[in-house]
Amino acid sequence: ALFLSNRDLQIGRGEPVQDTARVLSRYLDGIMIRTYEQKEVEDLANYGSIPIINGLTDFCHPCQVLADLMTIREKFAVLEGLKMCYIGDGNNMANSLIVGGLKTGMKVSIATPADYRPDAEVMAFAEPNPNFFITDDPMKAAENADVVITDTWASMGQEAEKDCLLYT
C-alpha cells in the first residue's frame, strides 16, 4: 500500500489528471481514492488502466455503505425485506444508502429536509421503486425500521453552513 496525499501529487498544481492516471497505472495495481469531486474518480478511471475504488466523494460513499450493509447482514442474516431508515441531509451517504439498500432488496426510508434532498439522478433511480420512501418527518421515516442510520450534520462542502444546519 502506498499513501499519497494531495501534497504528494501534482494534480492540484496544474498536472492534468490524464498524466497522473497514466503514471500511477504504471506503478500500482489499483487505487483507492478519497476526494471531494466525483469527477476526479471518474477521470482517474477513464484515463488510467488499473481498477479505481471510490473511497469517498461529494456524490457517494460506497465503501462505507458496503461496510454498513455487511454489518446489518451480520446482525440480521439477510438484507432483503429489512427496512433501513436514514435520517440526515441528502448527502453522499444518503445517495449510497439509497442505491445499496434498494439493490439488495431492502426497504429504504429517508428523512431529510426539503432543501437537502438526495441527488436528482439517485432520486430518479429510487422513486419508481415501491420500497423507497422519502419524507421530511424523521418519525414517519423511522416507523417500523429495522435499522436507523444517521450521519454528520454538516457534510463535505457545507462547512460554511454548519452553524445554520445545527440550529434548524
Each language-model region and where it sits:
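Short, glycine/charged-enriched secondary-structure capping and boundary segments
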Residues: V17, A45-G48, A67-L69, I98-L102, ...
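Phosphate/diphosphate ligand-binding glycine-rich loop within oxidoreductases
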Residues: A1-R73
